[in-house]
Amino acid sequence: MEVTPGEARYLLSIFDLVRDGVKLSQSGLARRLGVSDPTALQMIRRLRQLGLVESAGLNLTSAGTSAALGLGHRRQAARVLALDVLGLDAEQADTEARRLAPAVSSALAQRLMRLRSARD
């Protein structure tokens, strides 16, 4: 499932927070993303309508988890591009990878990861 960059940002943030064992709240997510509570609520509602977030709480559905895993793979590939090809430092690479992940296709992600493997 393709998602917008905004949807991707929320999915990846929810996924990362859950993976790190952080108790999620709408306000905590809003703070992490630097948006207002109403803005976060609007996006959470949209993600629920898309079937990516459960109707109660901030847990990803199986479709949401699948989408987040795919985005995570693309984020890692974008990080490889930023670090290995563009020579950015780790912090810059992470920032750019978060921005680029929604725009990186699965095919490009696979090629970037192969490029890294070939260099290692």
Predicted features and spans:
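Short amphipathic alpha-helical interface segments
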Residues: 7-22
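Short acidic, hydrophobic short linear motifs in intrinsically disordered regions
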Residues: 20-32
